[in-house]
């Protein structure tokens, strides 16, 4: 099955169900304006419980938007994150100074986005492409032009985000052939509230794609 990251985890049951279904990564959002925000102290406690209760291997990914570098690195250590996802205007120099085992750079694909832009960042960094909004940093549920993701995918592996759900994940995989899929609002009944049935449907579709 294609790697799937479920982002915006705030509840233990949602995390355990996602892992039972085969999630490759779980995302914890440290951007206070987001309805999916979780305080780092709460995230550390939640992550500890997840690791105690689940025998699954997964990546714990912290999502940050334009944090001070020293504060971000402290959260990576204190929460026990495997990866830091930079979802703001962080430049290549900042990204290279992040002290996490993995660094992901997210790009919001707006009208002026150029497919070559991720190439400015170190090749070892994972690239995530998300829908663009003039008011929100992520989790908008907006699907963007997937031809841009295909163009990026020609030079480096891409995680595809932006409005992915059970209804379009098969088309996204077929059209883009991304390295992985990132889902947040697509498995929610309302902003920030994950829905178990939607999680199950998403993974059912993802598994069906892998068996085609």
Where does each model-flagged region fall?
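Conserved N-terminal beta1-alpha1 strand-loop-helix module at the mouth
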Residues: 1-212
């Amino acid at each position: 099955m294609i790697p799937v990251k479920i982002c915006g985890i705030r509840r233990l049951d949602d995390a355990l169900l996602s892992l039972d279904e085969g999630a490759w990564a779980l995302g914890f959002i440290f951007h206070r304006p987001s309805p999916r925000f979780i305080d780092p102290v709460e995230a550390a406690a939640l992550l500890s419980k997840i690791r105690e209760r689940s025998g699954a291997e997964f990546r714990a990914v912290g999502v940050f938007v334009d944090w001070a570098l020293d504060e971000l690195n402290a959260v990576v250590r204190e929460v026990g994150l495997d990866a830091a996802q930079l979802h703001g205007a962080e430049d290549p120099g900042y990204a290279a100074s992040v002290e996490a085992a993995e660094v992901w750079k997210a790009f919001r694909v707006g009208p002026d986005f150029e497919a070559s832009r991720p190439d400015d960042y170190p090749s070892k960094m994972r690239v995530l492409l998300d829908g663009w909004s003039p008011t929100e940093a992520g989790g908008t549920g907006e699907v963007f032009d997937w031809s841009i993701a295909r163009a990026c995918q020609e030079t480096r592996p891409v995680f595809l985000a932006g409005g992915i759900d059970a209804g379009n994940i098969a088309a996204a995989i077929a059209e883009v052939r991304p390295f992985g899929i990132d889902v947040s609002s697509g498995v929610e009944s309302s902003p920030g509230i994950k829905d178990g049935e939607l999680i199950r449907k998403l993974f059912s579709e993802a598994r069906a794609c892998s068996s085609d």
